[in-house]
């Protein structure tokens, strides 16, 4: 059994990750919050035996084998490196870090320490996206030529705060949502992005210059072009993910979500058909793969390197939106 420590008393851990760890044979034995009061309450609420107030205490605990980092973005590097130095496996929330240099440092450190580093990109675990990837690989739409991602949602009040108010913490829709688009596109297309263009704005929710909406496009190395629309501000929009090829189209609806829902339609000269989907919990799929990787079998659903690619794409979108010019996507890996 893999024993986990949590860095951060986060909503995502409470709503999704703690349950996924337990459902896949792991145990959550400790959690860390800089607030002793909050940490104790969180631990009690979630059935966690220990609560500590420092990263050093958590990663130094011999009862902890792996660490889940879900603090604000600017803290990811130092906390992940501390865990790696202590010989712990790490599943880190996206984005891995605030800069590519820091993200690469995390990947190299994990490799040299011989521990597993994963990025918590949940969407590549969705049955819809896996079915689309398989259909493309099987040639069911011919050669992919374009993709479209609709990921404009409404950020609920309990998730607002720093995402809308703190640029220094990595707030804003690009590093929160666009990085997920980037990873899902890479996964489904089995292709790497090369260049991005974008326009961003604040429609009233973002403060301190934080963008709450962005539209843009990405050109992939194969020549596929993809467009995306991401936002925190749209209460009634539907999410979607489409890939269009020379011989057909894949149309995913309600698939850019944490829940195991949505549909995928294959449309071609023969008509329309629904792809069969297994509605498995996305986070349980991710944690099962992570536990297997710890045991020496395979790798996480999204590796540290995958996290570098999504961050590189997100930062290119930030640059393109700021300059009005196309920005190259380079990881330095």
From Swiss-Prot:
It is an enzyme of class 1 (oxidoreductase). NADP(+) binds at residues 9-12, 33-34, 38, 71-76, 93-94, 120, 162-163, 283. Optimum pH is 6.5 at 30 degrees Celsius. InterPro entries: Gfo/Idh/MocA-like_OxRdtase_N, Gfo/Idh/MocA_domain, GFO_IDH_MocA-like_dom, NAD(P)-bd_dom_sf. Changing residue 10 to G: Almost no effect. The keyword NADP applies. SUPFAM superfamilies: Glyceraldehyde-3-phosphate dehydrogenase-like, C-terminal domain, NAD(P)-binding Rossmann-fold domains. Its EC number is 1.1.1.292. It catalyses: 1,5-anhydro-D-mannitol + NADP(+) = 1,5-anhydro-D-fructose + NADPH + H(+). GO terms for molecular function: 1,5-anhydro-D-fructose reductase (1,5-anhydro-D-mannitol-forming) activity; nucleotide binding. Keywords: NADP, Oxidoreductase. Monomer. Catalyzes the NADPH-specific reduction of 1,5-anhydro-D-fructose to 1,5-anhydro-D-mannitol. Also shows some activity against structurally related compounds such as 3-keto-1,5-anhydro-D-fructose, D-glucosone and D-xylosone. The enzyme cannot use NADH as cosubstrate. Belongs to the Gfo/Idh/MocA family. This is 1,5-anhydro-D-fructose reductase. It comes from Ensifer adhaerens. The gene is afr.
């Amino acid at each position: 059994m893999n024993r986990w420590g949590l860095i951060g008393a986060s909503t995502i851990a409470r709503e999704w990750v703690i349950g996924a760890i337990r459902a896949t044979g792991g145990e959550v034995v400790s959690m860390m919050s800089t607030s002793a009061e909050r940490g104790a309450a969180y631990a009690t609420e979630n059935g966690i035996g220990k609560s500590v107030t420092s990263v050093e205490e958590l990663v130094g605990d011999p009862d902890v084998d792996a660490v889940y980092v879900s603090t604000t973005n600017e803290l990811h590097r130092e906390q992940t490196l501390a865990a790696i130095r202590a010989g712990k496996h790490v599943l880190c929330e996206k984005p891995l870090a605030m800069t590519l240099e820091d993200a690469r440092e995390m990947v190299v450190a994990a490799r040299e320490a011989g521990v597993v580093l994963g990025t918590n990109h949940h969407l590549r675990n969705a049955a819809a996206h896996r079915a689309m990837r398989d259909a493309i690989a099987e040639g069911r739409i011919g050669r992919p030529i374009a993709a479209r991602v609709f990921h404009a949602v409404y950020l609920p009040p309990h998730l607002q705060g720093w995402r809308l108010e703190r640029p220094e913490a990595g707030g804003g829709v690009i590093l929160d949502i666009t990085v997920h688009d980037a990873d899902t596109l890479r996964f489904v297309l089995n292709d790497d992005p090369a260049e991005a263009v974008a326009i961003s704005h604040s429609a009233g929710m973002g403060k301190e210059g934080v963008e709450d909406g962005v539209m843009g496009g990405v050109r992939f190395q194969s020549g596929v072009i993809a467009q995306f629309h991401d936002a925190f501000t749209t209460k009634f929009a539907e999410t979607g993910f489409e890939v269009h090829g020379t011989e057909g189209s894949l149309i995913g609806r309600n698939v850019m979500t944490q829940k195991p829902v949505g549909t995928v339609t294959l449309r071609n000269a023969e008509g329309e058909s629904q792809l069969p989907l297994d509605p498995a919990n996305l986070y349980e799929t991710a944690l099962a793969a992570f536990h297997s990787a710890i045991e020496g079998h395979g790798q996480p659903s999204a590796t540290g390197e995958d996290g570098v690619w999504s961050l590189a794409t997100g930062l290119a979108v930030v640059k393109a939106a700021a300059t009005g010019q196309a920005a190259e996507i380079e990881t330095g890996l």
